[in-house]
From Swiss-Prot:
BP terms from Gene Ontology: carbohydrate metabolic process
Signal peptide residues on this chain, from the entry's feature table: none
Family statement drawn from the similarity comment of this UniProt entry: Belongs to the glycosyl hydrolase 13 family. Sucrose phosphorylase subfamily.
Protein's UniProt name: Sucrose phosphorylase
Gene3D superfamilies in alphabetical order: Glycosidases, Oligo-1,6-glucosidase, Domain 2
E.C. no: 2.4.1.7
Source lineage: Bacteria, Bacillati, Bacillota, Bacilli, Lactobacillales
Length: 490
C-alpha cells in the first residue's frame, strides 16, 4: 500500500492491548476510519530504550506477535517502521561476533572504533577540545569500553544508552547490513522508513558530529537509492532548529513538523495567534505534523518561530497550566538525556481541558502536511504518574499501557469522540490535497482563519478559531462540518 494522505497513528505494539493482534482489533473496532496509517514503534527484539536498542531486525519480538500480524496491518493501513541507522544493540550478532573474534571478525569494521578513528587525525587526538566539540547526549566522551574474548580492550563510539553501540555507516559491511535490513522491512509491509537519530550517524574529525554536511546527504541518498525502486520513502527524524528540516525538505524528503507542538501550546496559553499564523504560512506540505510522540515535547524545535521570551513563557505556563507536570519529571533524576524536551501528554499539557485540546488538534489538522497522532493523544490521555514513579523514567509519563477495556471506555469520552470525527472528516476531505494551497489570516490578535484548498480549486475547507475563547468553526464548501457549538457532548 502506498503512503496515503490520511492521519497516521503512532503506537507501540503492546500499548493498545497486549500485542499486534490487539492493535489491529482496536483500529477496526474502536478507531475506525479516523486512522489511515500506522507508525509501529520498534517491535523487534531489543535490549533497551523501549525497542530503540534493536538486537535483530529479522524477527518480530515474540511477545508482540509475528510478521504475519505486521503484514495483516499493512493490508489495511500504510505502515512506517523505525530503522536505527546510528546504532544497534550489544546483543546483536555483529557486536557479539566482534567481541568474540576481534580483528578476525567479519564485523571488525561495523562499529566506530574510537582509538582508530582518532589515530587517523594525528597524534595525541582526541584532545579535550575535540571531545568538547562533539554534540553529546551525555556529559562525557561518547564511548564505551569493549572487552574482547582475547582479553584486550578498546573503546567504541556510543552516543546514546549503554545498549546502543554506534555503527560505522561508511563501512562496506554496514552498508550491506543497511541495504538488506531496509529491503526486508519493505518486504514485510513498510511504506515509510523513519530514520531514527540519523543526524548522529556521520562522524568526522573537526566537526560536532551532528548533521555533518555534505556527508549526511550522501548517507540519505544511499538510503533513498535503496528504497525508491521499492516504492518506499524515508522520514528522517531530527529535533533541531526548523531550518534543518527545511533543508531536508528542500532535498525532496518528507520531514517532521516538530515546531508545531510548542507553537500551538504558546497560542493556546497566550490566546495570541500571530506566531501560529507565521509558522503555518512557512510550513511545507510534504511533512508529517505532530503534537505528541513517544518522546517529550520539543522546545528547541520552535526557536526563532517563537522568540526566546515566548518559549520561556510557554515552558513556564506548561508547568503552571499542565496537570501533573513537574520540572523534575524532565530532569536527570528521571533518566532524561534531552534537557530540551518536556515530559507530559499533550492533553495534560493543556490542563486536561477538552476545549483547548480539541482546538489544538483542529490546528494540527489544518496545518500543511499529514497529521500523526500518538496513541495516548488519540485517547486524550492524562499523565501516567503511577508508571512514571514505578519506573523513574521521565518519558513513561506519556506511555500508558491501555487494556482493551480501557480503550473501549476512552473512545466514548466526548473529547475523543469529537477527535475521531474530526480525523475521519480530514481523511476524506479533498481540501487537504498536499498539492493544494493554504492561506492564513489573523483578523484580530486572538483569532485565526485558515483556508485549505485542493490543487484545482474545487474544494475548500475554512477554519475560523478564537485561541483566547477556545472556540472554532469548520466550514467545507459552504457547509458547517464541526464547531464548538455542535460537538458531541456525551
Amino acid at each position: 500500500m502506498e503512503i496515503q494522505n490520511k492521519a497516521m497513528l503512532i503506537t507501540y505494539a503492546d500499548s493498545l492491548g497486549k500485542n499486534l493482534k490487539d492493535v489491529h482489533q482496536v483500529l477496526k473496532e474502536d478507531i475506525g476510519d479516523a486512522i489511515g496509517g500506522v507508525h509501529l514503534l520498534p517491535f523487534f527484539p531489543s535490549t533497551g530504550d523501549r525497542g530503540f536498542a534493536p538486537a535483530d531486525y529479522t524477527r518480530v519480538d515474540a511477545a508482540f506477535g509475528d510478521w504475519a500480524d505486521v503484514e495483516a496491518l499493512g493490508e489495511e493501513y500504510y505502515l512506517m517502521f523505525d530503522f536505527m541507522i546510528n546504532h544497534i544493540s550489544r546483543e546483536s550478532v555483529m557486536y557479539q561476533d566482534f567481541k568474540k573474534n576481534h580483528d578476525d571478525s567479519k564485523y571488525k569494521d561495523f562499529f566506530i572504533r574510537w582509538e582508530k578513528f582518532w589515530a587517523k587525525a594525528g597524534e595525541n587526538r582526541p584532545t579535550q577540545a575535540d571531545v568538547d566539540l562533539i554534540y553529546k547526549r551525555k556529559d562525557k566522551a561518547p564511548t564505551q569500553e569493549i572487552t574482547f574474548d582475547d582479553g584486550t580492550t578498546e573503546n567504541l563510539w556510543n552516543t546514546f544508552g549503554e545498549e546502543q553501540i554506534d555503527i560505522d555507516v561508511n563501512s562496506a559491511i554496514a552498508k550491506e547490513f543497511i541495504k538488506t535490513t531496509l529491503e526486508d522491512m519493505v518486504k514485510h509491509g513498510a511504506n515509510l522508513i523513519r530514520l531514527d537519530a540519523f543526524a548522529y550517524a556521520v562522524k568526522k574529525v573537526d566537526t560536532n558530529d551532528f548533521f555533518v554536511e555534505p556527508e549526511i546527504w550522501d548517507t540519505l541518498n544511499e538510503v533513498r537509492e535503496i528504497l525508491t525502486p521499492l516504492k518506499a520513502e524515508i522520514l528522517p527524524e531530527i529535533h533541531e532548529h526548523y531550518s534543518i528540516p527545511k533543508k531536508i525538505n528542500d532535498h525532496g524528503y518528507f520531514t517532521y513538523d516538530f515546531a508545531l507542538p510548542m507553537t500551538t501550546l504558546y497560542t493556546l496559553y497566550s490566546g495570541k495567534t500571530n506566531q501560529l499564523a507565521k509558522w503555518l504560512k512557512m510550513s511545507p506540505m510534504k511533512q508529517f505534523t505532530t503534537l505528541d510522540t513517544h518522546d517529550g515535547i520539543g522546545v528547541v524545535d520552535a526557536r526563532d518561530i517563537l522568540t526566546d521570551d515566548e518559549i520561556d513563557y510557554a515552558s513556564e505556563q506548561l508547568y503552571k497550566v499542565g496537570a501533573n507536570v513537574k520540572k523534575t519529571y524532565s530532569s536527570a533524576s528521571y533518566n532524561n538525556l534531552d534537557i530540551y524536551q518536556i515530559n507530559s501528554t499533550y492533553y495534560s499539557a493543556l490542563g486536561n481541558d477538552d476545549a483547548a485540546y480539541l482546538l489544538s488538534r483542529v490546528f494540527q489538522v489544518f496545518a500543511p502536511g499529514i497529521p500523526q497522532i500518538y496513541y495516548v493523544g488519540l485517547l486524550a490521555g492524562e499523565n501516567d504518574i503511577a508508571l512514571l514513579e514505578s519506573t523513574k523514567e521521565g518519558r513513561n509519563i506519556n506511555r500508558h499501557y491501555y487494556t482493551r477495556e480501557e480503550v473501549k471506555s476512552e473512545v466514548k469520552r466526548p473529547v475523543v469522540a469529537n477527535l475521531l470525527k474530526l480525523l475521519s472528516w480530514r481523511n476524506e476531505s479533498p481540501a487537504f490535497d498536499l498539492a493544494g494551497s493554504i492561506t492564513v489570516d489573523t483578523p484580530t490578535d486572538t483569532t485565526i482563519v485558515v483556508t485549505r484548498q485542493d490543487e484545482n480549486g474545487q474544494n475548500k475547507a475554512v477554519l475560523t478559531a478564537d485561541a483566547a475563547n477556545k472556540t472554532f468553526e469548520i466550514v467545507e464548501n459552504g457547509q458547517t462540518v464541526m464547531s464548538s457549538d455542535n460537538l458531541t457532548q456525551n
